[in-house]
């Protein structure tokens, strides 16, 4: 897997980088493992916009991914590595010995023809799924469960991996990609290795159109809106926001203000909060 760039024969191709798709071995999805996808366009069940700047984009078939890895002690052969339009990571098609087919997230370095397995007695190899209690310290894992049997919920993005740093009692301590250190129950499953397509973070859209293909609409700055639409709006010309700090369209402090509920029950499992990420836009004022 790598990236490919173009000669600057148009302004957009000067900046664009795309994946070379070298690891893809099959172009058409397994029909029995696909389903239609409801496109909410950022709306909730009442039709109100709850996630701004969503809509349009290319129609996509959803690939049914096995995040649970609950088919224990049955070997599976990696039959193909495929592109998935619903995520940055690639997916691997598995053929189990009993005839069943499933998709999983493609671990980095996993080749077609490799035999993988899940279960508490599985060998310690990339792509195998084991309980956290059976995974050695210092190991990189992905697709980590937060509740036993619920399926992997965290560390699923392209190139992501968490590290097992400690074990004590009923819990295993993981260092997540965000920098957060968190306790997870020892009987939760995780997959050995790092998620593939590690170069996804290095890709550049190059033009607005590629973002529109993905259903991402333009982001309008609050300072160019009217006062009825945003607290930063209004004024003559390029006016300052008129506040001590930037706020959301609903008046809540943003760009650094903590939003996590202090009474959230899962807070007791967080050993160290994630590191601060810079989300400031142009001039550090917009939301």
Swiss-Prot record:
GO cellular component, one term: large ribosomal subunit
Keywords: Ribonucleoprotein, Ribosomal protein, RNA-binding, rRNA-binding
Record SMART domains: Ribosomal_L2, Ribosomal_L2_C
Keyword Nucleotide-binding: no
Gene3D superfamilies from the UniProt entry: 2.30.30.30, Nucleic acid-binding proteins, Ribosomal protein L2, domain 3
Domain of life: Bacteria
Coiled coil spans: none
Protein's GO biological process: translation
Keyword match rRNA-binding: yes
InterPro entries noted in UniProt: NA-bd_OB-fold (IPR012340), Rib_uL2_dom2 (IPR014722), Ribosomal_uL2 (IPR002171), Ribosomal_uL2_bac/org-type (IPR005880), Ribosomal_uL2_C (IPR022669), Ribosomal_uL2_CS (IPR022671), Ribosomal_uL2_dom3 (IPR014726), Ribosomal_uL2_RNA-bd_dom (IPR022666)
Listed GO MF terms: rRNA binding; structural constituent of ribosome; transferase activity
Region (Disordered): 25-57, 203-287
Family to which this protein belongs: Belongs to the universal ribosomal protein uL2 family.
Assembly description: Part of the 50S ribosomal subunit. Forms a bridge to the 30S subunit in the 70S ribosome.
Job of this protein: One of the primary rRNA binding proteins. Required for association of the 30S and 50S subunits to form the 70S ribosome, for tRNA binding and peptide bond formation. It has been suggested to have peptidyltransferase activity; this is somewhat controversial. Makes several contacts with the 16S rRNA in the 70S ribosome.
Protein name: Large ribosomal subunit protein uL2
Organism annotation: Nostoc punctiforme (strain ATCC 29133 / PCC 73102)
Annotated gene: rplB
